[in-house]
UniProtKB/Swiss-Prot annotation:
Name of the coding gene: moaC
Composition skew (Basic residues), residue ranges: 1-12
Binding site for substrate: 90-92, 128-129
Keyword Lyase attributed: yes
Descriptive protein name: Cyclic pyranopterin monophosphate synthase
Entry keyword set: Lyase, Molybdenum cofactor biosynthesis
Domain of life: Bacteria
Family annotation (NCBIfam families): moaC (TIGR00581), PRK09364.1 (NF006870)
Pathway it works in: Cofactor biosynthesis; molybdopterin biosynthesis
Ranges for region Disordered: 1-20
Functional description taken from the UniProt entry: Catalyzes the conversion of (8S)-3',8-cyclo-7,8-dihydroguanosine 5'-triphosphate to cyclic pyranopterin monophosphate (cPMP).
Length: 172
């Protein structure tokens, strides 16, 4: 049975910063950025894919059945950054200036450290694009090795750094 949407309105108490994607009556909305200046913005995100040492060795040696795991994941992450507005409903479509996805095998984890950097000159930031790039790159690694190891874990996806815009510099 389908649930009826709640008619409860959000509290009007000013206890902290307002959510920019929520309208006065609680509806989701896309933020109007038309009056914001175009400035250079950068976001960096990272995450980890944890696996056994044997699976990591298979990836590093290039002997995975599905092919070049790291190269495929890198391209998937770049593609995902460019399509973020199609995946996350209230994100603005952006003409990204640069997307890099770096994947470092790490025997100490064991696993792979995935890091994405996204740059734009525009009226809104690229945090979601960086996080989406990392998420999809990690998921691609998982997809390409799941037949070898079912216990693979994706962990720690987070924003590492953000530069530009009204809120300035952030570093985790």
């Amino acid at each position: 049975m389908a649930r009826k949407p709640s008619k409860t309105r959000p509290s009007k108490a000013k206890s902290g910063p307002a959510l920019t994607h929520i309208g006065a009556t609680g509806e989701a909305r896309m933020v109007d950025v038309s009056d914001k200046p175009a400035t250079e913005r950068l976001a960096v995100a990272e995450g980890r894919v944890l696996m056994t040492r044997a699976t990591l060795d298979l990836i590093v040696s290039g002997n995975a059945k599905k092919g070049d795991v790291l190269g495929t994941a890198r391209i998937a992450g770049i593609m995902a950054a460019k399509r973020t507005s199609e995946l996350i409903p209230l994100c603005h479509p952006l003409a990204l200036s640069k997307v890099t996805v770096d994947i470092e095998p790490d025997a100490k984890l064991p696993g792979c450290l995935v890091r994405a950097s996204v740059k734009v000159t525009g009226p809104t930031g690229v945090e979601m694009e960086a996080l989406t790039a990392v998420s999809v790159a990690c998921l691609t690694i998982y997809d390409m090795i799941k037949a070898v190891e079912r216990g693979v874990r994706i962990e720690g996806i987070h924003l590492v750094e953000k530069l530009g815009g009204k809120s300035g510099h952030y570093r985790a």
